[in-house]
Structure formats: C-alpha cells, structure tokens
Swiss-Prot record:
Sn-glycerol 3-phosphate binds at residues 13, 83-84, 135, 245. One of its GO terms (biological process) is glycerol metabolic process. Activated by phosphorylation and inhibited by fructose 1,6-bisphosphate (FBP). This is Glycerol kinase 2. Pfam families: FGGY_C (PF02782), FGGY_N (PF00370). Glycerol binds at residues 83-84, 135, 245-246. It is an enzyme of class 2 (transferase). One of its GO terms (cellular component) is cytosol. ATP binds at residues 13-15, 267, 310, 314, 411.
Amino acid sequence: MSAKYIMAIDEGTTSTRTIIFNHAGQKVADAQKEFPQYFPQPGWVEHDATEIWNAVSSTIANVLIDANIKPNQIEAIGITNQRETTVVWDKQTGLPIYNAIVWQSRQTAPLAEQLIADGMGDLIHRHTGLVTDAYFSATKIRWILDHVDGAQKRAERGELLFGTIDTWLVWKLTGGETHVTDYTNASRTMLFNIHDLQWDQTILNLLNIPAAMLPEVRSNSEIYGTTKDYLLYGSQIPISGMAGDQQAALFGQMAFEPGMVKNTYGTGAFTVMNLGEQPQLSDHNLLTTIAYGLDGNINYALEGSIFVAGSALQWLRDGMQLIESAPESESLAQQSHNHNEVYVVPAFTGLGAPYWDSETRGAVFGLTRGTTRADFVKATLQSLAYQSRDVIDTMKNDANITMPTLMVDGGAARNNWLMQFQADISNVKIIRAADLETTALGAAFLAGLAVGYWQDLDELKSIHQTGNVFQPRMAAPQRANLYQGWQAAVKAAQLFKHTPIDAQSSTN
C-alpha cells in the first residue's frame, strides 16, 4: 500500500511554497516559486493574482515530481496565505478586474483616515476587533470598486467576487465551483463581526460594499471542495484546511492553550497570543482576531502586526546591496562590537502595532564616521527585535500576563544572533520551532484533521518537536538603555513625517 501524505500550499507575499508532510508531521518535499510585486506609486504594493495562481500550479506539479509522489497519495490539501491582500474578479471569466492590493499597501490610507474622521473607528473596533487601517481588506475593496469603471454596478448585480488569497486559490483549484473563506481570513477584512461570526451589514453599508460579492465563511478544518481532475492528473483531492498565515503558524506551534504566544518572522513579524474562547478587545492598539474555529468552537487571539521584518533584510540585499543573502546578516552582526548607537527604523510602509502610523517613513539614527557595514546590518536586525518587544510589552499590558516564553518561527528565526538579541532585549526565553515552516505545517494539520489523517489535537501534540532555546543574558541596565534609544528613534522618525517634502520634485 502506498504511503499517504498531506499537501500544504503556503502562499506568501513574495513567493509560493507547496510542501508535502508525512504522518509524523515531517516535511517530505517542497517546491518554491517567487513572483513579482508591483509598486505603481510610492507606498503602493500590488500583485498580479494570475501570477500567484501560476506560481501555485507550478509548485504543486514540481513538488509531486521531485518527491516522486502520485496525486492519489495526497489525502488532503491545506491552504495558508498572506492575509488581507484583496482580489476582485469576474465571476464568469475568472479574471481579476484589477491587481491584487497587498496587505502592505498604503494606497487606501485616505479612506481609512476618513472613516476615523467620521467617528467610525470605535464601531469598527467593537465589531471586528481591528483598528481602522488601510492594512485590512475593506478599504481595498472600496478602492477597487471606485477606480475600475463600472465595478460598483457590476458588484451590485452579482457579477464580481471578492476574496483574500485563500478564497482565490480555492476558487481556482475547484474550477470556480467554490467561493469560500475561513474564520481567520474573514476576521482580517475589517468587514467580519467576530462576535456573531457574520459579515457585518453595518460596515458593509458604511462602505457601500455589496454582500453578494463576499464568500461564505467556514471553519478552519472541513472539506470545502475538491480539486478539478484536470489540475492534478485526474485526482480529485479534498481541500480541507485553511487559515491565514499567522493563525496557521499559531496552530502549527501547538499554541492550543490560552496565554500561549508565538512570533513569526516573515516579510513582516507577527506576535499572536491565544486568548481562548472569549474575545478581549485591546486597550493599546493590538488586534483582536480569530485564532481558529474547530468543531463549532472559536478560539480568539490577540495580535501585534509589524509591517517590516524579513523585508528589511531584502532591502539590505536588493536595495542597499549591503549583503548578498539574508544568512550573511548573522555573520556581519557578530562582527559589530559595541556599536549599538545606530538605530534603523524600517517604517518603509508606515509603522504597525502598537503605533498604527501610516505616514512615518524609514529612518536611520546615530551614524558616525566610524559606522561600518556590519554596524548598519546589525542595527537593521536589531530593529526586528525592538519592534517585536514593542508588541510583547503591549501584549503583556493588555492581557495582564508575564509571558516568560515566546515560540518563534519563520525565515528570519534561523538567525541565531537575532534570536539571542530578541531574548535579551525582551527578557523572555525564546523557543525556536524544530521546523521553521510552522505556517505550512499548521495548514497541513487543519487539513489532515478534517479527513481523519490525524485524529485530534492530542495526536498532534504527540508528534510536536521544538528546536533551540535562547535564554536572556543581557544585564537589565543595558537592556533598558538600548530600548530607550529605540523609543527615541521612533519618536524622531515620527517627528520627521511632519516636514513638508515633495518626494516627486526634481532637482534638475
């Protein structure tokens, strides 16, 4: 009898990965394909949703070929995805009517600011658990309907569909038969009432978004549909698990109990705490969101979202050409001795939690003639940890906990220097996942549970493995001094945003 596996599609901000896992939760094979981002104007970030679908199709084929696994050996498919990113497409042709507007994009900031000015921020917070920001899908939908000719009328006639990336991929995989999302992705749209678990008609009316274009919201672990036989060599495979990337990582880290916290270092960095079955609205600009919904039960989460983390290392590599690869940043940081006076504030698309400041832009402070490439790279790495501490401290205040342990995953978590500095500056024990692909693993677990590949959460716990542990070892006065410098750097960057500079003006 042939071995059986679970396939996970991990659709990220810069690349797509498809990973095959065995019953022990171990990665058997993976395939990855990058796709471009588009920047039509400063602060705007877009994708071509068709390019995303092509990347997914390519990695599915490649991983099966590379692993020499037949499609009929795949028991189920799980999907995890960059959240908030918004696609609107023609229901008949299946073609997007505009580029996908990415979660990082600030092109809808004026819409969000107008909602706040109109006094809608409190209502949106109470109903959705979110702050009113361009980060979420709601204003992105409104922008597309406003800027594509005839889109509003077509949406009202039921000719257009909206989806976050999970919805788009399920639609494509099922040949246009299934238009669904899950609780976690719905909770990131700024249109979903996290208390009654329905699309919020008050907010839909406020933004004049037709309900007809919205997907059905389902649990995180159930069979949503099956793949079309022409996609996987004749096999019809159940698609049975879906979760936004950060919730999938929380699930993959086995953070099933209230108070458990994980931090994922991806393109951005995202600290998420399991709140249990009772939502708790933040008093300090964190997000209340849905962690997962299983078997009729909903677990909520508190989240701090940092817009720039791993993308800062991409900037060092591609924009500044200070490193040739992300791993090189670790060795360079080790070469920088006692030069902690340099601070990089990587607010390339504004500041996320707990500031929620869309106008501040990136800045560097503390440069001297003696500053080296290694110092600059180290300061950029430190900015990831400083931002994470901002969120950790805020989360402690909101949830009234001590948080002795932080579970970490994601690409930048491979950096030992960064993980030690994170432990030091936050004064918490860091436990790194044995396999940093916990996002995909979480999606695989959700899919496997739905089809009986794994029986329950206890079975998942029995196969869970952890990796390296990093204990804090920095003296308290040094920790306080470094963090005070970071806070001053953030304030200085925020002050600079008020300086009237025309970025489009020419000096010629």
